Regions:
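Glycine-rich phosphate-binding loop signature in dinucleotide/nucleotide-binding domains
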Residues: 50-55, 120-122, 210-213
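ATP-binding/phosphotransfer module of carbohydrate and carboxylate kinases, centering on a glycine-rich
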Residues: 2-4, 158-241
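N-terminal glycine/serine-rich phosphate-binding loop of ATP-dependent small-molecule kinases
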Residues: 1-92
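Short beta-strand-loop/turn "lid" adjacent to the catalytic site in phosphate-handling enzymes
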Residues: 52-105, 142-148, 153-154, 182-193, ...
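Gly/Thr-rich phosphate-binding beta-strand-loop-beta motif of the actin/hexokinase/Hsp70
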Residues: 1-24, 117, 123-145, 161
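Short, well-ordered alpha-helices that flank and scaffold nucleotide-derived cofactor binding pockets
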Residues: 18, 45, 75, 79, ...
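Glycine-rich phosphate-binding loop plus the immediately following alpha-helix
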Residues: 31-38, 106-108, 113-122, 146-192
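A generic secondary-structure signal
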Residues: 45-50, 116, 120, 203-207
C-alpha cells in the first residue's frame, strides 16, 4: 500500500491506496500546524482506526502547497514509516508535459489533479478544484498541460464579503429555494453558489473556444458537490483526484 498526503491551505488529506484503489481517506486541519510528534500521533490514530499499521505501507507521497507544513510532515512521515516520502514536484514524470511558463511555480495540487484525471478521463481535459481557491487546469489532446485559471474559492469569497461588511448576516452556504433571494441571507448564499456556478460555466466556454474543441470536465475539492450541481455544463464530480 501507499500512503498519500495532500497538504492544502485548509486541510490535510491522508489516503491509503492499494494499487489504484482508494482504501480510506481522512482529513485534518492544516491551519493549526502540529509538531513532528503531533503528526505522528495523528497518523497512528488514523491507521489504527482502519485496522492498519505503518508496516502495511511500502511508501508514501506528499503533495503540498504549504511549505511551512511540508518539512515537518515529511519528517514525521519518515520517522513513522521508516523511509523518506516522495515529494510531488514538476520534475517528476507525471504522464504529461508541462508547457506553462515557470513550471516550478505551478502548485502541486494542480499537478496532482491532472495526474489523477488523465488516467480516468478522455482528453482534452479540464480539471476544476473548488477549494480555498478555485483552480482550472487545461490539458490538450497531446497530453500537454497548457495552464489554466485561478479565482477565489467559494468559502474564501464568502468570508471576505462578511469580513468587509458590517451588517450582512453570517450563515452556511447553501442554495435557497429560489434564485431571487427573499432575504439578505438568501441573497448572499444564492449569489455565492449561482455566481460561482455561472462563472464556471462561462470560463469552460471560453477555454473550449480557445482550445477549438470540447473537453472532458472534471471537478473535485470541498465545494464541488455544493456548486457543480448548479452548473449547466456536463461536469464529472470526482472527489478522489
Amino acid at each position: 500500500m501507499v500512503l498519500t498526503i495532500d497538504i492544502g491551505n485548509t486541510t490535510i488529506g491522508i489516503g491509503g491506496f492499494q494499487g489504484n484503489k482508494l482504501l480510506f481517506i481522512e482529513k485534518i486541519s492544516s491551519r493549526r500546524p502540529l509538531s513532528d510528534a503531533g503528526y505522528r500521533k495523528k497518523l497512528n490514530m488514523i491507521l489504527n482506526k482502519h485496522g492498519l499499521s505503518a508496516e502495511a505501507f511500502e511508501g508514501s507521497v506528499i503533495s503540498s502547497v504549504v511549505p511551512s507544513v511540508t518539512a515537518v510532515f515529511s519528517s514525521a512521515l519518515e520517522a513513522f514509516l521508516g523511509q523518506k516520502p516522495l515529494l510531488l514536484t514538476h520534475e517528476l514524470d507525471l504522464g504529461y508535459e508541462i508547457c506553462t511558463e515557470f513550471p516550478e511555480k505551478v502548485g502541486c495540487d494542480r499537478l496532482a489533479d491532472i495526474a489523477g484525471a488523465i488516467s480516468r478521463y478522455p482528453l482534452p481535459l479540464i480539471t476544476i478544484d473548488l477549494g480555498t481557491a478555485t483552480t482550472f487546469n487545461v490539458l490538450d489532446e497531446n497530453r500537454r498541460f497548457l495552464g489554466g485559471l485561478i479565482l477565489p474559492g467559494v468559502g474564501t469569497a464568502h468570508r471576505a464579503l462578511l469580513g468587509k461588511t458590517a451588517q450582512l448576516p453570517k450563515g452556511d452556504i447553501h442554495m435557497p429555494a429560489h434564485t431571487i433571494g427573499a432575504n439578505t441571507q438568501e441573497c448572499i448564499t444564492g449569489g455565492m453558489l449561482l455566481g460561482n456556478a455561472c462563472a464556471i460555466d462561462g470560463l469552460i466556454r471560453h477555454i473550449q473556444t480557445e482550445l477549438g474543441q470540447k473537453a472532458t470536465v472534471v471537478a473535485t475539492g470541498g465545494y464541488a458537490t455544493t456548486v457543480i450541481p448548479h452548473c449547466e455544463t456536463k461536469i464529472h464530480i470526482d472527489q478522489n483526484l
